[in-house]
C-alpha cells in the first residue's frame, strides 16, 4: 500500500518534470548543438530520476571520450535505463530506440530531437548490421 501511495504522488511530478524538461531541451537545442546541450541533458535526466523516486549509483568509472568511439551496452531493465546512462556519462552519446517509441507524443519528439536512431525490432539482424 505504501508503494502505491508513493507512486501516485511521484508519477505526476515525474510527468510534469519530463514535459517541461523536453520543452526546455527543444528551446535549448535551437541555439546550441546537441553535444553542447549534454550538460543540460545530464541535469535533466538526474531530475527525472529523482522525481520518479529512482536512485542513481555509479560503481566503477566510465571511460573518458578520447577521440575514439565507444559502444555502451547495458541490460535494458526499465524505462529509466536511458535516463541513467545519460546522467552517468560526461559526454554526448547517441542511443538507439525501438521504432514504435517514436509514435509517443512528447517522448517520440524528444527522441528525434536528441538524435536517437530508430530500430525495427522485427528486423533485428538488419538492425544489428546497420550498427
Describe the role of every protein-language-model region.
Residues 54-131:
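Soluble catalytic domains of membrane acyltransferases
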Residues 1-57, 109-110:
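A transmembrane-helix-recognition feature enriched in membrane-embedded lipid enzymes
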Amino acid at each position: 500500500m505504501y508503494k502505491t501511495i508513493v507512486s501516485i504522488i511521484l508519477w505526476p511530478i515525474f510527468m510534469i518534470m519530463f514535459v517541461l524538461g523536453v520543452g526546455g531541451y527543444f528551446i535549448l537545442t535551437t541555439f546550441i548543438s546537441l553535444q553542447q546541450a549534454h550538460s543540460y541533458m545530464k541535469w535533466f535526466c538526474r531530475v527525472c530520476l529523482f522525481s520518479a523516486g529512482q536512485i542513481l549509483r555509479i560503481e566503477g568509472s566510465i571511460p573518458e571520450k578520447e577521440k575514439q568511439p565507444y559502444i555502451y551496452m547495458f541490460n535494458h531493465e526499465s524505462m529509466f535505463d536511458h535516463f541513467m546512462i545519460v546522467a552517468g556519462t560526461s559526454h554526448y552519446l547517441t542511443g538507439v530506440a525501438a521504432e514504435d517509441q517514436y509514435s509517443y507524443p512528447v517522448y517520440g519528439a524528444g527522441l528525434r530531437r536528441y538524435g536517437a536512431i530508430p530500430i525495427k525490432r522485427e528486423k533485428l539482424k538488419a538492425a544489428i548490421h546497420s550498427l
